[in-house]
Swiss-Prot record:
Pfam families: GIDA, SAM_GIDA_C
Record GO cellular component, one term: cytosol
Descriptive protein name: tRNA uridine 5-carboxymethylaminomethyl modification enzyme MnmG
Annotated GO MF terms: flavin adenine dinucleotide binding
SUBUNIT field: Homodimer. Heterotetramer of two MnmE and two MnmG subunits.
A GO BP entry: tRNA wobble uridine modification
HAMAP family with a match to the protein in the record: MnmG_GidA
Organism of origin: Magnetococcus marinus (strain ATCC BAA-1437 / JCM 17883 / MC-1)
Binding-site list for NAD(+): 271-285
Amino acid sequence: MFNQHFDVVVVGAGHAGCEAAHAAATLGCRTLLSTQVIDSIGQMSCNPAIGGIGKGHLVKELDALGGVMGIVADQSGIQFKKLNQRKGPAVHGSRAQIDKMAYRKNMKKILDACANLEIKQAEVVELIIKNSCVVGVKTDWNEVYSCGAIVIATGTFLDGLIHIGERKFPSGRLGDKESHPLAVNIKSLGLKISRFKTGTPPRLDGRTVNIEKLNRQDGDAIPSPFSFMHDKIERPEMPCWIAQTSKETKQIIEKNIHRSAMYSGQIEGVGPRYCPSIEDKIKKFKEREVHQVFLEPEGENTNEMYVNGVSTSMPIDVQWQMIRSIVGLENAQIVKPGYAIEYDMVMPTELDHTLKTKKYDGLYLAGQINGTTGYEEAAAQGMIAGLNAARFAKKESSYRFERYDGYFGVMVDDLVTRGVDEPYRMFTSRSELRIVHREDNADMRLTPLGHELGLVGHKRWEKYLSKKKQYDLLEDLSQKFKINGQPVSEILKRTDCDLEKVCEAMQLDALSKNVLEIYKNDLIYSGYEKKIIAENSRVEKYRSHVLPKEIDWSKVASLSSEVRLRLEKSDCRTVADVIATKGVTPASVVNILIYLGLK
């Protein structure tokens, strides 16, 4: 019956699928990565960028554990920026503009070189399950492969439906067919399924953009790599450009809002809160006359530009009017239309903390199928699912990431315990221990774990050991070395500490300076860590506390508009109910306790 046997089969070669396949193969499993189109491996279907606040943390943690997204981003980046630098290092976020074609090429090169991994261009149309355990898959070529575990990483392809104004048609991504047979098969499994939607803006011919009317945006003078395997970035940079919509843009959208698939009632799926369409912005922020737009190059060898901030499901004739009403885009040519896409997703409460379905052994889900949005969230889930699929296939115990491990654990716990009612995006505010879970120390926190799990290779482990040795030496030296009679360890705790002068006095090289900066941040945050642990203990103490019958959530200080809205719609009777409410962050719970006078 079976053509071949694989230990692990990964369905879909987007960001989740690539990491899942790489992790499983690294752990010694014979792994099949199945994709409709081999040339689309690692495709960046929407924005040509990786990272951001919270998202960059996921990429750093993924890299520290032996993942590949950070390495490929460094190889393919055309502009690098560290976001939030005016704030503390705990919330600094790495972000890079990416050459989309280079990213695909570099990702495929890594996967092609990965031992134990086979890539096939075939659409999986059926999961073969016996006695509530996966045993194989069937492809559109009528080939049947037996396997020990399966990772489903289908992105927006499960019964994907594209909307451009009044027009709608089945598609997994513009130009690619949807996965209908597998969607039907998964529906038959009895899992709780819903529909989400996402959107993307038009792409322009950059040669038709008048950059003289736009503001140039460059990256950091000294780019910071994503991967701890890289000490510096050696790639040419490309600028982005900042524009603004106009009053005319607003008028065009208001006049044609009934033709938007989002507002005509044509779309039923729920979209991402933090990536609204331009129609949403005009409707929800009526007082604003203009909105900022970023023009981002899609690569070195293409003229295409991504219009960040103008995601839309308007018909194509309205898209032309909208684009040409933006200053600098009066003569712009659209080369690809913007669109919205609806797709099937499985409620993540159907999963356990290893991303295995509770109903079926050996069946793991990763990425947008779990209700998340973003390349980074997908990639992190891919590693978790691939790791555990491999361990299941080898009859080893599963590994569960906990919230205290980092953003990996925070994301999975949020998904499987709270579920989602809109696409989930990572933010630093979701972590109780965000001052500990920093980007700069991700390797110090997680590379030993990755090594223990078998995900970290020899070169990465040797690099970690060298860095750890240097950290320990600098920690000891900073306690003994004095500047103006004061130990360096005390100077580093001061907010006005000039790290450059300290390094100069200690005669440290650039690499040692980076390690000293990590130690400095550890020192600064050590006191805050104790405070947060105390706050978490207080939250646990008052979990069963009954709330007053009527609370005016608008009077609780420092709650975001999302948290207020969710609490107003909920029927929370205890502190535990507040904690369990989707979208309520740990900091919000602490603020509520303060408001209630619970010390």
